Amino acid sequence: MAKLPVEKMRELERRFGEIEARMSAGPAADVYVKLASEYSELQPVVTKIRVYEKAVTELADLETLLEDRSVDREMRDLAELELPEVKEQIEALEQEMQILLLPKDAADEKSAILEIRAGTGGSEAALFAGDLFRMYERFAAEKGWKVEVLSASEGEAGGYKEIIATITGKGVFAKLKFESGVHRVQRVPETEAGGRIHTSAATVAVLPEAEEIDIEIRAEDIRIDTMRSSGAGGQHVNTTDSAVRITHLPSGIVVTSSEKSQHQNRAKAMQVLRSRLYDAERQRADSERSADRKSQVGSGDRSERIRTYNFPQGRVTDHRINLTLYKLDRMMEGEIEEVVDALMADYQASQLAQLGEQQ
């Protein structure tokens, strides 16, 4: 196990005390809001640090007592009984704190932009893209998050050729960021008379929703085109005369939106563009840091096949962590927490391993 970063722990305690003092002094409302946000972020970490420090002190006291021959035998026997318990508590606390003290992803608390595109497999791929969107929509509903479709292009037989949506809530990106990649489906299409299993795929991209403070977009770097657009109808698609296409000239990124008004379109297209540019920046930074990355989880490679959904066997396999679950029906209803948590645990384990190598 990697050693706990003692200096970092002391710095967090010092900062926490400083925030408490500043909040007690009655600062201006905007300053108080920022301090309160940092306070709530630090509180669980500092609370755990204090519990750990108390346990370490208790262990030292017990060991001193055991070595002191002037202490009566009964007291030493009690100390000997308590010792394994305290050691076990310290070990458990160290494991918890390793996770709490891992470097934080600045985007983890953000909302997210979800993009799903049908890949190989024609109309069956579009149907699968629709199934994936509903899966994430139900997961979001269970979490109390808000889902809003920004644009959608329906498949001829249903589903979506492409669908882009915002998922708004605290910590959405942290939960869904490992969903990016190629999702493959194996099933018998309804139109398949011979009962043969077909394989098709859809690509998922989960981007942290960027705010204006995160990324600057200069007016001279974008071209805005307005055009007539009509969607294919359906629950999530609006028919409009005011579709907007925004091209970011330096990167070549193109975003379209077809809401009911040009103002809404421009705002939503800019929202997606900002998030794509922010994500591209994060990807560049990650690739510079990832030369020694051991974990396939979190590699950010969206061309990588990450998961297979085998309908005849009711099986879902995540290839990055070799996890297979026979609960496909429940997962398609939005019960993806088990996979999400397993991916996060694997990623954290790889971070801990790297920290251990660095020390």
Curated annotation (Swiss-Prot):
GO molecular function, one term: translation release factor activity, codon specific
Mod. after translation: Methylated by PrmC. Methylation increases the termination efficiency of RF1.
Name of the encoding gene: prfA
Subcellular location: Cytoplasm
Main location per the UniProt record: cytoplasm
Similarity comment: Belongs to the prokaryotic/mitochondrial release factor family.
UniProt-recorded name of the protein: Peptide chain release factor 1
Pfam families on file: PCRF, RF-1
Sequence positions bearing N5-methylglutamine: 235
Entry annotated with the keyword Transferase: no
Any one cellular-component term (Gene Ontology): cytoplasm
Keywords, ordered alphabetically: Cytoplasm, Methylation, Protein biosynthesis
Stretch list, region Disordered: 280-306
Stored PANTHER family: LD18447P (PTHR43804:SF7)
The protein's role, per its UniProt record: Peptide chain release factor 1 directs the termination of translation in response to the peptide chain termination codons UAG and UAA.
Keyword Ribosomal protein: no
